[in-house]
Amino acid sequence: PGAIQIVERLVAWADVIVENNSTGTMDGLGIGWSDVRRLNSEAVMMSSQLMGSHGLQADWTGYGPTIQTAGGLSWLWAFDDGEGPPGSNAIHPDHLAGRLGAVGALAAIIGRDRGASGAHVEVAQVEALMFTLADHFLAEALEPGSVRPRGNASPDGAPWGAFPCAGEENWAVICVRDDDDWVRLRKAMGDPHWARDPLLATSIQRMEARARVENGVAEWTQTLDRAEVQDRCQAKGVPAARMMFCVDQLEDPHLIDRGFLVDLEQQALGQIVMAGPCFTGSRMGPPAIFQAPLIGEHSRRFCVQDLGMDSVLVDDLVASGALEALDELP
């Protein structure tokens, strides 16, 4: 009971409530949208579930890597060789849904400030993902069977993709956009005999012989460090980049020069490096980047100063376990 009391006070105080629980969880706790409207008619609530709050599969649970299957991305990323999708632990559908939800919540706040009431914004993660593949759905609708698993291949040229380099799990990406790029790549590779074949002179010919061409490029890249592949290609004007691990990004001269990497002193951890803002503006202030609080660090202050709760009541809630408070920093 005490915990619900805190949550209800929080809802009454808040402008925006964001929830990312499985379908029905908030209603079951007594803080669903109807409860939010009763407690605070001006509040905006943003909900994001895997498949949405209603529909035949609304009870499915999961996150980014799992929704890639239902959203069609795993199939599209597979290689067109009859084998199953290799799978991916990429979580970018989570980022898509979160950012769309934030935009929706901000739009609802703007609407409220212009005279509208509070609103409930919903983002189904599967729909956010499928929206990014809209051109593929349109192409398949216009020409059934035209969309196939692509792997790393591109319809814009060949060779194009990630190529193995010397060492364990080291790769470099090379993109040959046109015939001029192909001539430049041949020079970067030392113009091997197989690459001089006139049957590989045009983009169409190379795409038809994609496996042969990319196997030939892979034989070359496997003899070199990934950075060497990148540098040799870029020196000839061919788009290429090494695959970077996190430790590489921390030492990347370009990211350092742009000031993207932010050093931060984090309590209980020490010095850490954070990613900076993904966009900046000439009329925007510096990003608000600060150390994370410890669990319960601000509980008492927030309940008393922001929610207007009596300090004795807060003590009782802490003692009952309804509220966690950190009274002394470690």
What are these regions (language model features)?
Residues 312-330:
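Amphipathic terminal alpha-helices
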Residues 1-6:
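PLP-dependent aminotransferase-class I/II
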Residues 8, 13, 21, 25-176:
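Active-site-adjacent "lid/gating" segments in soluble enzymes
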Residues 8-11, 106, 182-186, 218, ...:
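Non-transmembrane alpha-helical segments in soluble domains
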Residues 159-236, 240:
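Aromatic-enriched alpha-helical interface/lid elements that frame and gate functional surfaces
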Residues 235-289:
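A glycine-rich dinucleotide-binding beta-alpha-beta segment and adjacent secondary-structure elements
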Residues 201, 268-316:
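Flexible, small-/acidic-enriched active-site or ligand-binding loops
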